[in-house]
Amino acid sequence: MMVEASFRQKQENRPDAESGAFVGHGGIPGEGPYISIWLTLAQGTVLDIRCRCNGCPSALQVTERCALILRGRSMAAIRQLDRADIELIAGKLPDGKAYYYDLARTAIENLRKEELN
């Protein structure tokens, strides 16, 4: 699957805090496996999505494919996604890597308006 080169693990994948993005984390960035999602909304619909993860190919697969499906959806529709949906969206992962489905689901569950520091 071809994905924009800028998607992969670059700092620009995180929007500025001033963008009014929603942010959710599955796992703790810098402390092992994690997936972080930032959504920018326009009229209740996802206009832009940025993701970061720990860099494992399985984490990249899940975040890339989730990003493709989340863009253009409402927050209500996104919050209805369950683990089975994410597994279907992301495709099969190698043995022992299924926890990335759960990390993505947790990041979605934890989506909150990002606070300015």
Mark where each language-model region is:
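Domain-level signature for proteins that mediate thiol-based redox and metal-cofactor handling
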Residues: 1-117
